[in-house]
């Protein structure tokens, strides 16, 4: 079995049960590994047999990724796709099980995650105007992450039907095609409603994407949102700014405010507590440093009926 054919079969196999987002991830990142094999062995992928892939080649690929200067977390993200592909090849009998022997992911980065402060969020908000389509759209995107804990992919896939303005909640199809419900706070509700009414010909029952490229009906992509953040990082002067930091800030602020860990797990869409518990540490760290972490709307912490 040659590498190109194995790659094609791998994608067909995973398309039967993986989300579209996961397939895009595998297609891009496994292709990087396939290109590496082609460069190292001096042949096209359809001329390379899977059984020539060695443990040494796999370690060389990991070494090349480390040489890019990316953080360990990013390197592990790229390398994970190659490992999944190789495990598929091993299970199908295309290559030896020895190729992944003692090949481990890199240790997690030790750099602390510092949630955004109230002052920093004010700086971010000040970079946009609610009076323009672009500004209002971007504010909605930012506060979906900051006030609802959305991932970047959640923002892109949110539809008209996923917003319930009457009952104040959002429904999103997240990782693994799992649906979850998140509370819609007043500030975010107002911004979303104005954006949809003014710029998106909003009808509650339709399944159209909420966000579009400015002046068009073309849906935004994850790449276009990343470009917004790249510009925002320069303009705001917040060097550590990236989309997932806003989700971290939401979760940390929820814990600091006295939020329930089980509620947080459900809102973030985590399958277990292992990842969610990280925010207990971040919350304690922020308290210890007397950090003025961005505060969520008080409605998140109302008690009683």
Feature locations, PLM:
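Conserved catalytic core of the tyrosine transesterase superfamily
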Residues: 1-305
């Amino acid at each position: 079995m040659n590498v190109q054919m194995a790659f094609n079969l791998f994608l067909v196999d995973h398309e039967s049960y993986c989300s579209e987002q996961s397939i895009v991830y595998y297609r891009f990142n496994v292709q990087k590994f396939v290109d590496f094999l082609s460069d190292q062995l001096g042949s096209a992928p359809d001329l390379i047999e899977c059984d020539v892939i060695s443990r040494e080649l796999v370690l060389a690929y990991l070494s090349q990724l480390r040489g890019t200067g990316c953080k360990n977390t990013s390197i592990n993200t790229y390398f994970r796709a190659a490992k999944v592909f190789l495990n598929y090849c091993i299970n199908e009998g295309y290559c030896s099980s020895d190729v992944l022997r003692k090949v481990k992911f890199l240790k997690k980065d030790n750099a602390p995650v510092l949630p955004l402060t109230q002052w920093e969020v004010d700086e971010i908000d000040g970079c946009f105007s609610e009076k323009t389509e672009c500004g209002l759209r971007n504010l909605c995107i930012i506060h979906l992450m900051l006030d609802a804990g959305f991932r970047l992919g959640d923002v892109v896939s949110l539809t008209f039907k996923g917003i319930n303005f009457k009952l104040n909640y959002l429904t999103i199809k997240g990782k693994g095609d799992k649906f979850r419900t998140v509370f819609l706070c007043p500030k975010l509700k107002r911004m979303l409603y104005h954006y949809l009414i003014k710029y998106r010909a909003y009808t509650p029952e339709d399944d159209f994407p909420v966000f579009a490229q400015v002046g068009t009906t073309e849906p935004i992509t994850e790449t276009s949102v990343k470009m917004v953040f790249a510009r925002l990082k320069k303009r705001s002067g917040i060097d550590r700014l990236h989309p997932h930091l806003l989700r971290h800030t939401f979760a940390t602020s929820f814990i600091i405010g006295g939020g329930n860990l089980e509620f947080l797990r459900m809102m973030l869409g985590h399958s277990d507590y292992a990842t969610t518990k990280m925010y207990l540490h971040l919350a304690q760290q922020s308290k210890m440093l007397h950090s003025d972490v961005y505060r969520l709307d008080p409605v998140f912490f109302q008690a009683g009926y």
